[in-house]
């Protein structure tokens, strides 16, 4: 079983969408993967953005029960791979002690995944699609 962590800022938009999408793709492809998400500035227990929930639901992914987790509450060494949404997140995780060889920026060809926070549903759909495509490519490498 491979443990994967997705990290963004507040753990209410990008990283929970990534977790849900990864879980669905892993299930559909029968891959032994466990996904988790967290945020560098998360308020533990905060709900996921309604637009993130709606955008994922359109793909048959239910993230409505996910709650925000601060990354400092996790043992980063327990993860086989850590995907961040920006180069800034990557640098912050390495500063917190994450193994730099395990940390990658999701959607690197675009410099990461843009934050949809505060955007409309179409903004979240574009973000979801970028995350989906990036994870689909990344799973081939695991």
PLM regions: where:
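Conserved active-site segments centered on acidic
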Residues: 1-77, 140-142
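Phosphate-binding/catalytic loops
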Residues: 81, 87-142
């Amino acid at each position: 079983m491979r443990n994967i962590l997705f990290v963004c800022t507040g753990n209410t938009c990008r990283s929970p969408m990534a977790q849900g999408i990864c879980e669905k793709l892993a299930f559909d492809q029968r891959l032994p993967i466990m996904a988790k998400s967290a945020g560098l500035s998360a308020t533990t227990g905060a709900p996921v953005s309604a637009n993130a929930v709606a955008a994922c639901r359109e793909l048959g992914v239910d993230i409505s029960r996910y709650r925000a987790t601060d990354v400092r509450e996790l043992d980063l060494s327990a993860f086989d791979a850590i995907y961040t949404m920006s180069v800034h997140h990557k640098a912050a995780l390495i500063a917190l002690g994450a193994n730099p060889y395990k940390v990658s920026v999701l959607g690197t060809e675009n410099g990461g995944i843009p934050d949809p926070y505060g955007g409309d549903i179409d903004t979240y759909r574009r973000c979801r699609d970028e995350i989906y495509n990036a994870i689909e490519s990344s799973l081939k490498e695991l």
